[in-house]
Amino acid sequence: MHEEKVALTKNQIAALRRAAETRSIQDIFVVACGGSLATLYPILYILDRETNAVHVSSVNAAEFFHNPPHRLGDHSLVILNSQSGTTPETVSAARLAHERGALTAAFTTVPGSAIETVVDFPIYYYDDPINPYPLL
């Protein structure tokens, strides 16, 4: 069962990668609230250290929505995270990014949630407190 979930997540990430490769991405924005934002810091860290081809930044979802980055547009990739998929600020930020032409992806644990309806690529991850490391 866990292998199927991992395979789905890998396929979703691969689809996002293929889409990103067809665009001239210049900016990557990592967007969420609270703990969901904190879980994206490894992505921010790796991109910041491993590439100088794109500008990478982390923005709180409410701030992103109320004061959108000037560089946000069709050369942007916006990576969001909402565990529930319903965090209002994150859903609003996703909608804004999508409307501005950015490629959007959101991590969530809830298929069919509100954030899925406003992003290009939902990516499901599975939060199982009883068995948090299913492949170990």
Predicted regions and their residues:
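A short, well-structured juxtamembrane/interface segment
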Residues: 4-24
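Glycine-rich phosphate-binding loops that contact phosphosugars or nucleotide phosphates
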Residues: 26-136
